[in-house]
Protein backbone atom coordinates (compact mmCIF):
# COMPACT_ATOMS: atom_id res chain seq x y z
CA UNK A 1 0.00 0.00 0.00
CA UNK A 2 1.13 3.58 -0.51
CA UNK A 3 2.59 5.58 2.37
CA UNK A 4 1.33 9.05 3.26
CA UNK A 5 2.50 11.73 5.69
CA UNK A 6 -0.27 13.89 7.00
CA UNK A 7 0.37 17.26 8.57
CA UNK A 8 -1.76 18.95 11.20
CA UNK A 9 -0.65 22.61 11.10
CA UNK A 10 -2.64 24.09 13.96
CA UNK A 11 -3.80 21.96 16.85
CA UNK A 12 -6.15 23.37 19.46
CA UNK A 13 -4.31 25.58 21.96
CA UNK A 14 -2.84 23.61 24.84
CA UNK A 15 -2.70 20.28 23.00
CA UNK A 16 -0.05 18.03 24.54
CA UNK A 17 1.67 14.85 23.38
CA UNK A 18 -0.61 12.79 25.65
CA UNK A 19 -3.65 14.23 23.82
CA UNK A 20 -2.16 13.20 20.49
CA UNK A 21 -1.46 9.73 21.90
CA UNK A 22 -5.15 9.43 22.72
CA UNK A 23 -6.12 10.52 19.21
CA UNK A 24 -3.67 7.99 17.75
CA UNK A 25 -5.23 5.24 19.87
CA UNK A 26 -8.64 6.20 18.46
CA UNK A 27 -7.19 6.02 14.93
CA UNK A 28 -5.89 2.51 15.61
CA UNK A 29 -9.35 1.42 16.81
CA UNK A 30 -10.96 2.80 13.62
CA UNK A 31 -8.35 2.10 10.93
CA UNK A 32 -9.31 -1.47 9.96
CA UNK A 33 -12.72 -0.28 8.78
CA UNK A 34 -10.94 1.69 6.02
CA UNK A 35 -8.03 -0.65 5.25
CA UNK A 36 -5.59 1.84 6.79
CA UNK A 37 -2.69 1.44 9.22
CA UNK A 38 -1.40 4.43 11.17
CA UNK A 39 2.28 3.61 11.74
CA UNK A 40 3.93 6.48 13.65
CA UNK A 41 3.37 10.07 14.61
CA UNK A 42 5.52 13.00 15.70
CA UNK A 43 4.43 15.93 17.86
CA UNK A 44 5.85 19.45 18.06
CA UNK A 45 3.99 20.85 21.08
CA UNK A 46 5.66 24.23 20.83
CA UNK A 47 4.63 24.77 17.19
CA UNK A 48 1.27 23.00 17.64
CA UNK A 49 1.95 20.56 14.82
CA UNK A 50 1.59 16.82 14.37
CA UNK A 51 2.88 14.58 11.58
CA UNK A 52 1.37 11.12 11.01
CA UNK A 53 2.83 8.34 8.88
CA UNK A 54 0.10 6.13 7.46
CA UNK A 55 -0.11 3.12 5.18
CA UNK A 56 -3.37 3.56 3.27
CA UNK A 57 -4.97 2.73 -0.06
CA UNK A 58 -5.65 6.45 -0.63
CA UNK A 59 -5.16 9.79 1.11
CA UNK A 60 -8.94 10.01 1.37
CA UNK A 61 -9.12 6.74 3.32
CA UNK A 62 -6.50 8.03 5.77
CA UNK A 63 -8.48 11.26 6.23
CA UNK A 64 -11.70 9.32 6.89
CA UNK A 65 -10.06 7.50 9.80
CA UNK A 66 -9.05 10.78 11.48
CA UNK A 67 -12.47 12.31 10.87
CA UNK A 68 -14.36 9.36 12.35
CA UNK A 69 -11.92 8.60 15.18
CA UNK A 70 -11.55 12.09 16.66
CA UNK A 71 -12.37 14.82 14.15
CA UNK A 72 -8.85 16.25 13.94
CA UNK A 73 -8.37 16.05 10.18
CA UNK A 74 -5.00 16.85 8.63
CA UNK A 75 -4.44 20.12 6.81
CA UNK A 76 -2.27 18.40 4.22
CA UNK A 77 -1.56 14.81 3.15
CA UNK A 78 1.50 13.94 1.06
CA UNK A 79 2.42 10.67 -0.65
CA UNK A 80 5.89 9.66 0.57
CA UNK A 81 8.49 6.96 -0.06
CA UNK A 82 10.59 5.39 2.66
CA UNK A 83 14.33 5.95 2.34
CA UNK A 84 17.19 4.19 4.02
What is the meaning of each model-derived region?
Residues 1-33, 37-39, 43-48, 65, ...:
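Short S/T/G/P-rich N-terminal loop/turn motif that feeds into the first structured element of a domain
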Residues 55-84:
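An amphipathic, aromatic/His-enriched active-site/gating alpha helix that lines ligand/cofactor pockets
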Amino acid sequence: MPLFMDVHQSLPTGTKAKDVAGAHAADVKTQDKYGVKYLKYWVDEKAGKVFCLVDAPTAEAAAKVHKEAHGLVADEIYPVSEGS
